[in-house]
Amino acid sequence: MGEVVNLSLSQRANHVLTHLYNNQESHIPYKKNQPVNFFNNVFLSTSKTHTGHTNYAPRALVFDLRYGLGSLNKHEYHETPTNFDNIPQSDRFNLDKQIAKNQYQQNLDKGIASTEAESILSVENTKFWTDYNKLIYSPSSLNTLQNYDIGQSPEYGSHHNFPQIKFNTFEVGQKEFSDSTSNLDSQLDSFRRLLEQCDLLQGVNVVSELDSAWGGFTTSLLTEFIDEYFNGGISNTKNSIWIYGLHSQGPSGRSSINEAISRIKTTIELSKNSTLFFPINTAPFSKGIFSSDTIEDNILRGEHERKIVNDIKLKSIDSSKVTDINSLGSIISNVDISAYYNMSAPKPQDSSSGYIDLSVPTTVPTKTSSKVINEYFVKNYVIPTEQGKLEEKFAFKDKGIPSNVYRSRDITSIIKVDTFPYKIFNSQKQFNFYSEFNVSTDYRIELKAYKDLIKNVRLNSQQLMGIIEDKAELIEDISHILEHYTISNEPSDEESDDDY
């Protein structure tokens, strides 16, 4: 099976990636005769020690704010630690920023099995993703920004020398990237080494944010990587580049006009730099069962411009009650993602719907016609391998809508890892669920709102001009995407674009 390289940018993204890699760590054979039942090389790179043992490391590049690595020193497992005992306190520099390791990490360093992880880990001692990370990263995989600190709040970083400047909008991220070009060569080299370690590259996963400057930074970084290693353009690459954009409303729960415009710009630019774009927080490993085509081909159905997967749901399974696709058990309630991923908690639906909706909600005011009806272009299900009986109950088909069903033996295993806070599902570790990823016309409502906002905004500040850059081009980009989420017989409420 082909390898996957992961790029993770931001503290939130790194929380998500850590759960992925902790799940991968649980598959590593630590005993000589232990059977290997997983393709560990997909997400992990391997190297042999002089004693013949195999080391596993994440096949990833991680980016964070300054001090975002928490208690982790990127070189500590690869160099002899410095002894500060004989250095006078007055000569020690910046040690006030040193963060002590929690008990869980201390146990890992000592080789003590953390059988009591549930009682050791808490919201209070897992502020950083490194507080419960279980794998050792290569130093070249860990990158921190030059000018922005993590600060007291995980939502936005602050400039190291000018704390009033926040790491909150698209153009700020672009500027930070351009100011850090001295690091670009090493980042390109690190990415190249990851690619060279692959025998058959399957694709690149990118986890970033929609609501901070990480969107601009990610766009600039991807532009360099794609130009250098993917034949000069996203349309020319034979590899998949899937981007997962983390959405939140910011510290106050409300967005300023600059932040709203920044979110629009980020969404459009990240979608342009991807072969599939998911405004969600995770992606289960999947294997097709009904088609020899790739997952990407199945979802796109030939419409490669309709790449934004806008409808995401997580549904519980109660096999004893399954009779059709709409009777799949009770609601997943009391979900508190924010406590563990530092994300906004999704709102559970009413008890009759049987799911929570992880789709990105409409984020700007909209004007919609009462005649508008939501229609699905394609529906996609990822089900647990052991739930094969679900296919006997129903074929996951919905009134002629093109549907794809994928099996994954990993989709429920993640909640069995000792670092996963399974109690957010108000359930035990044997909790079963499947996921649904759909593409529908509903996204055009959001796109129309984006277009209206950009058309009507006045470029009366340097910051807005920096975010939008070329207003006409941004409107054209939105219109281009909008075409592919609109059905031909839909009543048109479009206005002329001549007035921008």
Curated annotation (Swiss-Prot):
What domain of life does the native source organism fall in? Eukaryota
Q: Which UniProt keywords apply?
A: Mitochondrion
InterPro entries attached to this UniProt entry: DML1/Misato (IPR049942), DML1/Misato_tubulin (IPR029209), Misato_II_tubulin-like (IPR019605), Tubulin/FtsZ_GTPase_sf (IPR036525)
Pfam families documented for this protein: Misat_Tub_SegII, Tubulin_3
What Gene3D superfamilies does the record tag this protein with?
Tubulin/FtsZ, GTPase domain (3.40.50.1440)
Q: Where in the cell is it found?
A: Mitochondrion
Q: Which GO terms describe its biological process?
A: mitochondrion organization
What GO cellular component term, any one, is given? mitochondrion
Coarsely, its chief localization is mitochondrion
What does this chain do?
Answer: Involved in the partitioning of the mitochondrial organelle and mitochondrial DNA (mtDNA) inheritance.
So what family is this one in? Belongs to the misato family.
What protein name does the entry list?
Protein DML1
Origin organism is Scheffersomyces stipitis (strain ATCC 58785 / CBS 6054 / NBRC 10063 / NRRL Y-11545) (Yeast)
